[in-house]
Amino acid sequence: IRKQTILNLDLEQYEAIGAFQNTIVRQEANPIDKKLRDLLNAGAIKEFITQAILAKKNIIISGGTSTGKTTFFNAALKVVPPMERIITCEDAREIMIPHIPNRVHLVASKGGQGRAQVTMQDLIEACLRLRPDRLMLGELRGKEAFSFMRAVNTGHPGSISTLHADTPALAMEQLILMIMQAGLGITRDQIKNYVESVINVIIQLKRGARGVRYVSEVYFKETMI
């Protein structure tokens, strides 16, 4: 009977005997993400945004005051295929998707208006029962960010929202702070990892000296296979 021998080695010893010298590293973006990265590298921003929407990437449109976030949002939504079912959640009707017949617009109470106190978080939770293909949220402002992220991550890819921030990095930070407001009892690093795993694209808008609105930056997080 052959007795199995088990060596007691550490990783440094493995390295010393050359165990890692011929290792092949396979960390590849999936084909769709590779195409999107190629579009970005080529400076084809309009085509990148179009293909990202069609590929159902989760998108945040970020910008400061008066940078045209809602206008750009509506322009981007024209790319969404007309056969999809879209639910919008807003505190004022601004999202326009007339080319999509199967749509439902939900509106929250703003500033205590109306007899029923319906928050944005209430709308997000309600819309999940309406079985949307995508969820379009007018603007993320507070703890409803976690409900939005959870909805996006549980069967509603391709969802889009806007957020008030001056850079993609600050947009990520804003999302983290908003989710922390929900009091989930998880660490900041855990929230950061979650946000980075859910949000694929951040489109940053700026307002130029002559009032021209433009896309100043694009953040793109590739998924690996």
Please report, for each region that a protein language model flagged, where it lies by residue.
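Conserved P-loop NTPase
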Residues: 193-225
